[in-house]
């Protein structure tokens, strides 16, 4: 993916002295391209550190994002500096051998970045279509295998020219040109862009269809599970159920639906974020992969060198803007970025995986009216957590201290309005753990664990109902 320098296409077998460098142009290009490279390097390092330093981001999906950032980091740190020097000087100053190696690394990193987006799109399709089965389908071992396949496939695409699959090299070593051998151009364009693009678009079209269908069900206030014929309302009602098997089965079904609802909402938000990444990828790389085959197969229609340079650097730009997309479209990454940069927010830091609010109806008031005396537990920074365990349709809320020395129980006032904090510690389809406690908990006290019968739960994420 290296463009021609000067009039190399017309005199590739002749050696010319390098043209004098325009100082003002060199300074301007140096500032612009140097700033772009520095931004790309620091941004991708920030993405990697954000995932590495936050345990709640240690998931297979985020490992795929880290792999994308690694490919972009390698491109911006090892390829783009030489591309910038090439552009500023107007000729290649590093010899023929390094030109070939540099071009191969360029193709390797660009292909790995694109294939990583392809893997991410497949991951999002599985996450949105099968939110409860996702942890068993996408395991860490399978994720690692996928990452190895990404780099193996990228290596296969990139090493062809090193073994002679290219047009004859010019005698002038100040010329480092793109490999225009038609067979390799077709092979690399299909493998590096068009096949991954087809998969990406197919996956996101499917994600859009599934998300639209699920969202339509949520907006109507009803949710039907594929494995059951009964419809369950969005707001899950829990009442004292008989000890018989039917009551237990009903409670299990409702718990299943509520967790599925929550997981689907989170997967849909992740798909939106990565959908923006894919959209920017298409806008950045499509012009290059249109221009390159045209110039190779139809030399008479080869675009001017200036046009080729623009679309070439537009493709490079994609590796620099991904770190902007994450914090702008994902609150999760925004908070992680802020923590890494040690930016003090107006709100207290939350170590939760995802903020979750609960609206509760106390048993004594639930029958008097749906909204009367409804207790809202907003998101906060309490230092206690509860685990929800269910027996016969009744949820037990057990309050513990999360102090380092152990888990001491604390007092929860009978007046539930005094409870002012709630946040999620961890979530899986087996349990939900949250931070809940009074405004000024006293971890030193040890009292009987209270049990609260929940008649209605309304789940919300970041202030939005799910």
Swiss-Prot record:
InterPro entries cross-referenced by the UniProt entry: ADR_fam, ADRA1A_rcpt, GPCR_Rhodpsn, GPCR_Rhodpsn_7TM
Domain of life (superkingdom): Eukaryota
Protein name, per record: Alpha-1A adrenergic receptor
Lipid-substituted positions (S-palmitoyl cysteine): 345
Provenance organism: Oryctolagus cuniculus (Rabbit)
Side Extracellular, residues: 1-25, 90-99, 169-181, 298-304
Cellular location(s): Nucleus membrane; Cell membrane; Cytoplasm; Membrane, Caveola
Tagged with keyword Transmembrane: yes
Name of encoding gene: ADRA1A
Its biological purpose: This alpha-adrenergic receptor mediates its action by association with G proteins that activate a phosphatidylinositol-calcium second messenger system. Its effect is mediated by G(q) and G(11) proteins. Nuclear ADRA1A-ADRA1B heterooligomers regulate phenylephrine (PE)-stimulated ERK signaling in cardiac myocytes.
Protein topology in the membrane: Multi-pass membrane protein
């Amino acid at each position: 993916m290296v463009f021609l320098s000067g009039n190399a296409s017309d005199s590739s077998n002749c050696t010319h002295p390098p043209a004098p460098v325009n100082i003002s142009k060199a300074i301007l290009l140096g500032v612009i391209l140097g700033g772009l490279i520095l931004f790309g390097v620091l941004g991708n390092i920030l993405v990697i550190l954000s995932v590495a330093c936050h345990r709640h981001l240690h998931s297979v999906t985020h490992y795929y994002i880290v792999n994308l950032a690694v490919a972009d980091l390698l491109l911006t740190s090892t390829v783009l500096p030489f591309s910038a020097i090439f552009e500023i000087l107007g000729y290649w100053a590093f010899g023929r051998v390094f030109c070939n190696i540099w071009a191969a690394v360029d193709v390797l990193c660009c292909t790995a970045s694109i294939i990583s987006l392809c893997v991410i799109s497949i991951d999002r399709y599985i996450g949105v279509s099968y939110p409860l089965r996702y942890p068993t389908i996408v395991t860490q071992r399978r994720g690692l295998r996928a990452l190895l396949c990404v780099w193996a496939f990228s290596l296969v695409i990139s090493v062809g020219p090193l073994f002679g699959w290219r047009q004859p090299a010019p005698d002038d070593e100040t010329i480092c040109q793109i490999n225009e051998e038609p067979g390799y151009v077709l092979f690399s364009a299909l493998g590096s862009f068009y096949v991954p693009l087809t998969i990406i678009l197919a996956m996101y079209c499917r994600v859009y269809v599934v998300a639209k269908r699920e969202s339509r069900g949520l907006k109507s206030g009803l949710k039907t599970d594929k494995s059951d014929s009964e419809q369950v309302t969005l707001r899950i009602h829990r009442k004292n159920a008989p000890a018989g098997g039917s009551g237990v089965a009903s409670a299990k079904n409702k718990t299943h639906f509520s967790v599925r609802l929550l997981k689907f909402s989170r997967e849909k938000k992740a798909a939106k974020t990565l959908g923006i990444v894919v959209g920017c990828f298409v806008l950045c790389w499509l012009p290059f992969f249109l221009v390159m085959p045209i110039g190779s197969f139809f030399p008479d229609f080869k675009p001017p060198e200036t046009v080729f340079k623009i679309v070439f650097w537009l493709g490079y730009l994609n590796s620099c803007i991904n770190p902007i997309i994450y914090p702008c479209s994902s609150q999760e990454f925004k908070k992680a970025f802020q923590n890494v940069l040690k930016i003090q927010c107006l709100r207290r830091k939350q170590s939760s995986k995802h903020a979750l609010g609960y609206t509760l109806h106390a048993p004594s008031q639930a029958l008097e009216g749906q909204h009367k005396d409804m207790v809202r537990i907003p998101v906060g920074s309490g230092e206690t957590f509860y685990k929800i365990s269910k027996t016969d349709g009744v949820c037990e809320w057990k309050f513990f201290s999360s102090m380092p020395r152990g888990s001491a129980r604390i007092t929860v006032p009978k007046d539930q309005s005094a409870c002012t904090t709630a946040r999620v510690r961890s979530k899986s389809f087996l349990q939900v753990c949250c931070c809940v406690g009074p405004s000024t908990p006293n971890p030193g006290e040890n009292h009987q664990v209270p049990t609260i019968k929940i008649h209605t739960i309304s789940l919300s994420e970041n202030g939005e109902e799910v």
